[in-house]
């Protein structure tokens, strides 16, 4: 459960990300593909090379979904319902991959915003990403 302080940190972080969301999303995806090569199996039709237009486009989709989630912290299930359906019923993404991408996104954010990435912000973002992952995998059951 996200506290009011957690929510404030999450919203403040997403405000700081601003127009860099797509860039950070793509970088997090690249990190995920490099560190956890099995995640590439879900993207056989993508050019997964550094700077690929397809990875950049998907990174923007990831960032946009997280921005939507950050704007609807009090009702993540409704905000992410369509995305949950897509990942559970059509794409059938292994739930562990959400945790791997979340980890790589935290690393990316820490690398770009080291001063703002305090232990409290790290913890709050980790809780947020875990909540998003839980919602995205809720329809697998």
From Swiss-Prot:
Keyword Transport: yes
Record-listed N6-succinyllysine modification sites: 7, 11, 16, 40
GO cellular component: blood microparticle; haptoglobin-hemoglobin complex; hemoglobin complex
Residues of the signal peptide: none
Tissue: Red blood cells.
Secreted recorded as keyword: no
Binding, O2: 58
Keywords, sorted A to Z: Acetylation, Heme, Iron, Metal-binding, Oxygen transport, Phosphoprotein, Transport
Record-linked Pfam families: Globin (PF00042)
SUPFAM superfamilies for the chain: Globin-like
Modified residues (Phosphothreonine): 108, 134, 137
Domain Globin: start-end pairs: 1-141
Any one GO BP annotation for this protein: hydrogen peroxide catabolic process
InterPro entries referenced in this protein's UniProt entry, alphabetically: Globin (IPR000971), Globin-like_sf (IPR009050), Globin/Proto (IPR012292), Hemoglobin_a-typ (IPR002338), Hemoglobin_oxygen_transport (IPR050056), Hemoglobin_pi (IPR002339)
Phosphoserine found at: 3, 49, 102, 131, 138
Function: Involved in oxygen transport from the lung to the various peripheral tissues.
Subunit relationships: Heterotetramer of two alpha chains and two beta chains.
Protein name in the entry: Hemoglobin subunit alpha
Organism: Crocuta crocuta (Spotted hyena)
